[in-house]
Swiss-Prot record:
It is an enzyme of class 2 (transferase). It catalyses: [(1->4)-alpha-D-glucosyl](n) + ADP-alpha-D-glucose = [(1->4)-alpha-D-glucosyl](n+1) + ADP + H(+). It holds the Pfam family Glycos_transf_1. This is Glycogen synthase.
Amino acid sequence: MNVLHVASECNPFFKTGGLADVLGSLPKALIKQGINVSVILPKYGHLSDEWQNQLTLKKSFTVSVTWRNQYCGLEQFVDQGVTYYFIDNEYYFKRERLYGYLDEAERFTFFNHAVLSSLPFLDESPDLIHCHDWQSGLIPAYMKTGSVENPVPTVFTIHNLRYQGAFPPDVFRELLHFAPEHFAGLEMDGAINFLKGALVHSDRVTTVSPTYAQEIQTPAFGEGLHGLLHQERGKTRGILNGIDLEDFDPKTDPHVTYPYKHNQMEKRKNKQVIQRLFELPERKDIPLIAMVSRLVEEKGVPLLTQIAGELVTTENVQLAILGTGDPSLEDQLHHLASLHPHQISFKCVFAEPLARKLYAGADLFIMPSRFEPCGLSQMISLRYETVPIVRETGGLYDTIQSYNEEIGEGNGFSFTHYNAHDFLYTIKRALRFYRTEKEWENLLLNIYSSEVGWDVSAKQYTALYEEILGKRKVEA
């Protein structure tokens, strides 16, 4: 089975969020299931020389966009069994950022057209195309509307429904090359919506966790598409993301100062490293709580700013925060750190090496998200044997079971309602167990056995692909 993944970013080449992490690890897991996997993505201008020097030009051709034909280079290389293809066009992709330009509709219309034009030149013709997020959302629509000579089935994955690729209606006529009767399949509230086009036309829709698949069918989480998603629920599946266990391994991670596995003595040494780096008192006995996050409302940062002062004045605890985002939230965290310099430290940067050290050195990790389609940080936290405290939403609900001392089960702590009181109470509850050695050891044993890799999910994707292709054979 040949499966082509289409996405706008992929680790380690380009990354702005969790999509890149998924595309960096899922294909390798699918290869272990016996699938022949390739990935195609834009070749942005800041591709490092390490990768640039390995690329070979497969084919060059022109792609029609608006009234002009644009150059397209198809470049490729193979790494760890995955064939990576890059769509090269400097006009659209050699820019400072990956996203956020006025011609976004034209850029990613070109990308979708270029992917379809590339299909005859790939080493293996795909039996199925797996598209990710709105930037590849036109491909399922082209496959189902007679625009492609030899159409193949498509799977479309929603990584975050908030980002939909909505543009003025003129885009339909000027860019998309669809017949007029297909307008309704892409129109949403007077705009052309790339993501809606994918939902309507793909053979299957997946989300990145089972709970998120249910949540997005409600007005609270559906971002205006809940009605359509409820209508299409029969073809929608929630398949939990995983993390790359080879990449995220505290025993081999080059960023971890004292490598460890199931060894709290070495982990405490890493805590001292964090205390030093974050300029906090070096105390082994004080619980260290960490947060690594984009500093935005949806990540629950306002809950943290509400309770941080009370937390550190009523509990003997340290708080280390790493991330950037909303300037007002950054200012609030700077202010809290200035008020409590011996207990709160905030570094307004994002650096992967420092984040890895923080996962390794912290005792507890907080994720009070308002919504979280899947979340990878709680999985990394489990992998680094750091106890997560999460709000019960999306993938957080699916991965973290709140500790129950009566039966000794659970791999973290969680709260249901999005409010500061419940968040503070849950942190205090976790701290109570931290100070009870027997309970904490039992909790850590549960964490050691938590499954956060891709094996289970890769099998679910494989079964989904086989179901689609089997159905197609029957129909043929």
